[in-house]
């Protein structure tokens, strides 16, 4: 907690406060600050309870009782009591035990006999989110952090892991909406801060929207020849944007929980092609009779076929962009709703007018005198 607090302060202030700490605390805090930001090393509690395999159950409980009295007022009191690291004489990690394992063990049982086969650990240089996800997936109270030789350095507690996951969810939610995450509560942030956090992406998106305008200008002759086509532009680009955003959200979430990786791009494309095609066929089938009744079959067929093509394309774009972002080291959440929608808007119009140009070619030629 001291390391986290100092990390958020200006360098000069943090340095003065660090020098004011007792030597033992200063040494521990300096060690934590030596690890990269967002690393597991920055998040760990560097004073875990450590036992050797030949420690008896009674000796272990006695040590935990003594430690509980020493850290009764500490922020990680409950975790210090609930988890124990088992190491050899060189502090090489052998496994972790929970208090329940010791309490329920028969008298005289050695700690080493209680270790299970499945054990988890992370490097001090691993990403904090990776460590937090591991704690969540394995349902751990604490996750050991080790060095290159598997010697224990500390533990990451479940409460700290949940804070990391909450922060990641908040960050993804902001970026999915096209805004930078806030570093302070919403009601305490100034209006200028809120505007700055949102304005950057709005500028990017409004510049990207010029692609859509250029496409409309390029196909101006088609629109003038068949004016009815312009009526369906909002519906088509809206459908494509929504389909792409849904695909992006699914893949971003899958990346966050390590269900997919950038190398799975072909598998993702294969799945999204099928999903997009099925969605397009379903939507096209629903609207075809309505459009045929209100307008005429050529228009109905053009719009229905365009929806199939746009939904398929939008799902591919929405599925692939987060994988590309991850490969480039960019937060995949950036390529969620706003970016995908803007890109699909422009490319969707190209698909629409290209299909219309083929199906309604005779009508366009007659209208233009070609």
What positions do the PLM features span?
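Short, highly charged low-complexity linear segments
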Residues: 74, 121-129, 270-271, 342-350
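Alpha-helix N-cap/helix-start motif at coil-to-helix transitions, marked by capping-box chemistry
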Residues: 27-30, 34, 242-245, 315
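A short hydrophobic/aromatic micro-motif that marks alpha-helical segments and, especially, helix-coil
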Residues: 25, 71, 122, 259, ...
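Alpha-helical transmembrane segments and their membrane-interface boundaries
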Residues: 169-313, 320-343, 351, 355-370
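Cytosolic regulatory modules rich in charged/polar residues
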Residues: 1-231
């Amino acid at each position: 907690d001291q390391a986290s607090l100092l990390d958020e302060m200006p360098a000069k202030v943090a340095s003065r406060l660090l020098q004011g700490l007792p030597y033992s605390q200063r040494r521990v805090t300096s060690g934590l600050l030596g690890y990269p930001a967002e690393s597991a090393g920055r998040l760990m509690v560097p004073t875990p309870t450590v036992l050797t395999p030949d420690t008896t159950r009674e000796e272990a409980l006695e040590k935990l009782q003594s430690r509980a009295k020493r850290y009764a007022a500490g922020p990680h009191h409950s975790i210090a009591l609930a988890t124990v690291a088992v190491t050899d004489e060189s502090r090489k990690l052998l496994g972790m035990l929970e208090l329940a394992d010791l309490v329920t063990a028969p008298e005289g049982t050695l700690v080493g006999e209680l270790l299970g086969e499945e054990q988890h650990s992370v490097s001090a240089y691993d990403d904090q989110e990776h460590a937090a996800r591991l704690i969540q997936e394995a349902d751990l109270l604490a996750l050991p952090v080790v060095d290159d030789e598997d010697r224990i350095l500390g533990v990451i507690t479940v409460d700290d892991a949940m804070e990391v996951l909450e922060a990641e969810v908040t960050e993804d939610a902001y970026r999915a909406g096209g805004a930078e995450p806030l570093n302070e509560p919403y009601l305490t942030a100034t209006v200028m801060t809120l505007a700055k956090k949102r304005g950057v992406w709005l500028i990017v998106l409004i510049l990207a929207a010029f692609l859509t305008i250029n496409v409309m200008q390029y196909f101006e002759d088609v629109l003038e020849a068949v004016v009815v086509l312009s009526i369906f532009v909002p519906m088509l680009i809206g459908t494509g944007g929504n389909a792409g955003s849904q695909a992006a959200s699914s893949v971003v979430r899958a990346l966050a929980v390590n269900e997919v990786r950038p190398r799975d791009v072909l598998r993702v494309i294969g799945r999204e092609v099928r999903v997009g095609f099925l969605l397009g066929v379903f939507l096209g089938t629903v609207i075809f009779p309505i459009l045929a009744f209100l307008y005429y079959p050529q228009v109905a067929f053009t719009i229905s076929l365009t929806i199939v093509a746009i939904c398929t394309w939008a799902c591919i774009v929405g599925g692939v962009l987060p994988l590309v972002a991850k490969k480039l080291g960019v937060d995949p959440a950036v390529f969620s709703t706003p970016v995908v929608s803007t890109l699909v808007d422009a490319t969707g119009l190209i698909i629409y007018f290209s299909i219309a140009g083929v199906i309604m070619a005779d009508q366009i030629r007659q209208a233009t005198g070609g």
